[in-house]
UniProtKB/Swiss-Prot annotation:
Membrane topology: Peripheral membrane protein
A cellular-component GO term for this protein: plasma membrane
Stored SUPFAM superfamilies: EF-G C-terminal domain-like, P-loop containing nucleoside triphosphate hydrolases
Protein name as it appears in the record: Elongation factor 4
One GO process term, biological-process aspect: positive regulation of translation
Keywords: Cell membrane, GTP-binding, Hydrolase, Membrane, Nucleotide-binding, Protein biosynthesis
Function in brief: Required for accurate and efficient protein synthesis under certain stress conditions. May act as a fidelity factor of the translation reaction, by catalyzing a one-codon backward translocation of tRNAs on improperly translocated ribosomes. Back-translocation proceeds from a post-translocation (POST) complex to a pre-translocation (PRE) complex, thus giving elongation factor G a second chance to translocate the tRNAs correctly. Binds to ribosomes in a GTP-dependent manner.
Annotated positions binding GTP: 23-28, 140-143
Keyword presence, Nucleotide-binding: yes
SMART domains for this protein: EFG_C
Catalysed reactions, semicolon-separated: GTP + H2O = GDP + phosphate + H(+)
Cellular localization per UniProt: Cell membrane
Ranges where the tr-type G domain occurs: 11-193
Length: 607
């Protein structure tokens, strides 16, 4: 293509993504847009088409972002090229959203006509505003009996401050309003800025590993043009490669000769090493490099850590490969090797949140067929010692000796919870039970309230979200951000089985609730650990002090079965002999801890 053709094509490109709270109909809307632009034949169409991972389809959530190029003939008779970048809506995957938005000029904000604005919608809108996107509100699910589009329209204006007078009323399921949405995209979303003659700058917003083609980078071209055969350089790592193919997704990968300004597509350059392409990096030409890299994304720090161990320790290296491949297209995952006396070799992994942790675990078990044991999730604590040093602890078993600790600080988050006002009491009760401090309460309209609390991250990390949902019948929505560290009275609790400490069961707990937690966990372990041939004491200790204890009684066979009648001293002899044997067994016996027992440490707040 020559310069004029490229410029004409550029003016017809529209890059947009769809943002919404979980379950407001984002993936269905994407399906309808694909149908309307005839991207697929009727036969290829299936629900949630862009959610390509099995896990996404099963859980009905979007985890990874996805990109697709569509051709649309607008009412003005012109052909437009639309790039739709689908994004997740769940709080753990905000990072994926921020990456999608950085590659767009516009965003469709989908709001459920019955439920209105929720916490996650707001968080994503602010991300879109940070990236200076044109936001087009769409009120979805207007065919629901409980829909109230006018109230929601008012809410969009009041809460977000967007002009919603031209908001499209749509129903993705019934296919209403799809054409209006496409027309608005063409009309209101600006064409990509940038110059096809400038030195090349492409932003990598995702990547995938293909065993045959190496690493495939998903890119958005900001300036310049990239063709097959070009020598390109990654600006962050300085590595150079020759481009073997470029192309676009029409959901399927379709090869092209070149990608130019505004294009969203993929680039393969037989990159074999996973570490050479970093998401957020800029690709430029080796011969004529760009003066500076594009502003990447802020690197996300993991909030939650846990140990992952292969059940079969021979598969340790397979687990490392699996984690490296997942890290490639999930740049928020971090991991490093660790060992545990109870579980052998494994990895300490950092995640953005619990859903993220669960998804990674399931992906390893499914995609790589490795059975895992996970330890209790924990957060990063800062421990200040009496000798003036400070240590960072992300694994409870590394906690220093209590005598040498001056104070411990833990991370706090500011949680905003949107909830119908019938449930305010229930939510406040949960937050107080989680050591939350009440900050603020605001009414959005007559029926909904936003509560703001400061809560320790370690309290949210396990089942806060589940409790919130179950106590508000699923109506509460919740978003949190880290605000920093504050001192807390924290102690480390160890669990001893048969007088031996099991390092993988240790956890850090607030001193006030230590006694109760200890009692609950000891009872729970008593139910879960199978009975042995000898008696097993279970103890919960803080330092050298035992705070709770329980005993698993021994299984024993009836040694008196053969004595019919007979003398008492004969029976006594047999019983004493059995006791002696059990004692010997106890001194050498070791106790197998099942995976359920590790999970029990986590699910302690069930009662």
């Amino acid at each position: 293509m020559n310069k004029e053709e490229r410029a004409k094509r550029q003016s017809k490109i529209r890059n947009f993504s769809i943002i919404a709270h979980i379950d407001h109909g984002k993936s269905t809307l994407a399906d309808r847009i694909l149908e309307k632009t005839n991207a697929l034949t009727q036969r290829e169409m299936k629900a949630q088409l862009l959610d390509s991972m099995d896990l996404e389809r099963e859980r009905g959530i979007t985890i990874k972002l996805n990109a697709v190029q569509l051709n649309y003939k607008a009412k003005d008779g012109e052909e437009y090229i639309l790039h739709l970048i689908d994004t997740p809506g769940h709080v753990d995957f905000t990072y994926e959203v921020s990456r999608s938005l950085a590659a767009c000029e516009g965003a469709i904000l989908v709001v459920d006509a019955a439920q209105g604005i929720e916490a996650q919608t707001l968080a994503n809108v602010y991300l879109a505003l940070d990236n200076n996107l044109e936001i087009l509100p769409v009120i979805n699910k207007i065919d629901l009996p409980s829909a109230d589009p006018e109230r929601v329209r008012q809410e969009v204006e009041d809460v977000i401050g967007l002009d919603a007078s031209e908001a499209v009323l749509a129903s993705a399921k019934a296919g209403i309003g799809i054409e209006e949405i496409l027309e608005q995209i063409v009309e209101k979303v600006p064409a990509p800025a940038g110059d096809s003659e400038e030195p090349l700058q492409c932003m990598i917003f995702d990547s995938l590993y293909d065993p045959y083609r190496g690493v495939i980078a998903y890119i958005r071209v900001v300036n310049g043009t990239v063709k097959v055969g070009d020598k390109v350089r990654m600006m962050a790592t300085g590595k150079e490669f020759e481009v073997t193919e470029v192309g676009v997704f029409t959901p399927k990968t379709t090869q092209r000769d070149e990608l130019t300004v505004g294009d969203v597509g993929f680039l393969a350059a037989s990159i074999k090493n996973v570490g050479d392409t970093r998401v957020g990096d800029t690709i430029t030409h080796a011969k004529r490099p760009a003066a500076e890299a594009l502003p990447g994304y802020r690197k996300l720090n993991p909030m939650v850590f846990c140990g992952l161990y292969p059940i079969d320790s021979a598969r340790y290296n397979d687990l490392r490969d699996a984690l490296e491949k997942l890290e490639l297209n999930d740049s928020a995952l971090e991991f490093e090797p660790e060992t545990s006396q109870a579980l052998g070799f494994g990895f300490r992994c950092g995640f953005l949140g619990l859903l993220h942790m669960e998804i990674i675990q399931e992906r390893i078990e499914r995609e790589f067929k490795i059975d895992l044991i996970t330890t209790a999730p924990s957060v990063i604590y800062k421990v200040y010692l009496t000798n003036g040093e400070d240590v960072i602890v992300d694994n409870p078993s590394n906690m220093p000796d209590p005598q040498s600790i001056d104070r411990v600080e833990e991370p706090f988050v500011k949680a905003s919870i949107m909830v119908p006002n019938d449930y305010v009491g229930a939510v406040m009760e949960i937050c107080q039970g989680k050591r939350g401090t009440f900050i603020d309460m605001q009414y959005l309209d007559e029926t909904r309230v936003t509560l703001t609390y400061e809560i320790p991250l370690s309290e949210i990390v396990y089942d806060f979200f589940d409790q919130l949902k179950s106590n508000t019948k699923g109506y509460a929505s919740f978003d949190y951000e880290l605000i920093g560290y504050k001192p807390s009275k924290l102690v480390k609790m160890d669990i001893l089985l048969n007088n031996e400490q099991v390092d993988a069961l240790s956890f850090i707990v607030h001193r006030d609730s230590a006694y109760d937690r200890g009692k609950v966990i000891v009872e729970k372990l008593k139910e879960l650990i199978p009975r042995q041939q000898f008696e097993v004491p279970i103890q919960a200790t803080i330092g050298n002090k035992v705070v709770a204890r329980s005993t698993i009684k021994a299984m024993r066979k009836n040694v008196l079965a053969k004595c019919y009648g007979g003398d008492i001293s004969r029976k006594r002899k047999l019983l004493d002999k059995q006791k002696e044997g059990k004692k010997r067994m106890k001194s050498v016996g070791s106790v197998e801890v099942p995976q359920e027992a590790f999970m029990a440490v986590l699910k302690m707040d069930d009662n």
